Amino acid sequence: MKSTAKMIQRHPFHLVDPSPWPLVAALGGLSLTFGGVLFMHNYEGGGELLCLGFFTILYVMFTWWRDVIREALFEGQHTLAVQQGLRMGMILFIVSEIMFFFAFFWAFFTSSISPVFNIGGVWPPTDVVAISPWGLPFLNTILLLSSGASVTWAHHAIVGGLKKEAMQGLSVTLAFAIAFTAMQGFEYSGAPFGMSDGVYGSVFYMATGFHGFHVIIGTIFLFICTIRLYLSHFSCQHHFGFEAAAWYWHFVDVVWLFLFLTIYWWGFNITV
């Protein structure tokens, strides 16, 4: 009788089973960082250790999220209280990402508003030919804003139980995302300056490249959601996996708007 009483859960939270993935992820992170340092300093075995850590992290990401999906979909462990906790976790994660980009914008405004004498005392620097904002950057802005609209369309379709429309919305979003990444790569290949061309190149490639990395991550996120939607993993009430992906994608949209308005447009037109 006592053992039966102990099995009754008297709270709405999910107590996860013991898992090896936190430890394996920590070991993968150690291999990734330590191997990266060894590789950059040309030590023997650094590249192998770096690859081992990278593929370990990828494996843990796949298996850990697989377990989370199983707990939500097949075990019914994601109650309303659990979903609220997941939402708060995603919000805090996005806030931490905002802090990353805040540092890049800080570096840009520090360098552009008060340019030092060794770059000519002007912004853009005298030896740098800046990229016009009205070419590929403007096209990429249209692509990302359109993708934000299409992912919202998919979200409303999921809430309304319209699976076919949701699939169409996600497919359009993925097409826009892939086109954005391709255009960004094309822009980099034809850029008249590189990352080593002073503070302008460093700030430009760090900010836009880090954003491009987030676009790739968001594209993978949405692609996984498309597969899960096809497999009928989402319902009108339970679709936080997609909701998190949509939040992340809107965050990517907003960051790009700030990048376009500051680094591309304002940074191209100012003469300090």
UniProtKB/Swiss-Prot annotation:
One of its GO terms (cellular component) is mitochondrial inner membrane. It is an enzyme of class 7 (translocase). InterPro entries: Cyt_c/ubiquinol_Oxase_su3 (IPR024791), Cyt_c_oxase_su3_dom (IPR033945), Cyt_c_oxidase-like_su3 (IPR000298), Cyt_c_oxidase_su3-like_sf (IPR035973), Cyt_c_oxidase_su3_a-hlx (IPR013833). It is a multi-pass membrane protein. It is found in: Mitochondrion inner membrane. Pfam families: COX3. GO terms for biological process: mitochondrial electron transport, cytochrome c to oxygen. SUPFAM superfamilies: Cytochrome c oxidase subunit III-like (SSF81452). The keyword Translocase applies. The chain crosses the membrane at residues 20-40, 45-65, 89-109, 128-148, 166-186, 204-224, 248-268. Component of the cytochrome c oxidase, the last enzyme in the mitochondrial electron transport chain which drives oxidative phosphorylation. The respiratory chain contains 3 multisubunit complexes succinate dehydrogenase (complex II, CII), ubiquinol-cytochrome c oxidoreductase (cytochrome b-c1 complex, complex III, CIII) and cytochrome c oxidase (complex IV, CIV), that cooperate to transfer electrons derived from NADH and succinate to molecular oxygen, creating an electrochemical gradient over the inner membrane that drives transmembrane transport and the ATP synthase. PANTHER family: CYTOCHROME C OXIDASE SUBUNIT 3, CYTOCHROME C OXIDASE SUBUNIT III. Belongs to the cytochrome c oxidase subunit 3 family. This is Cytochrome c oxidase subunit 3. It comes from Pylaiella littoralis (Seaweed).
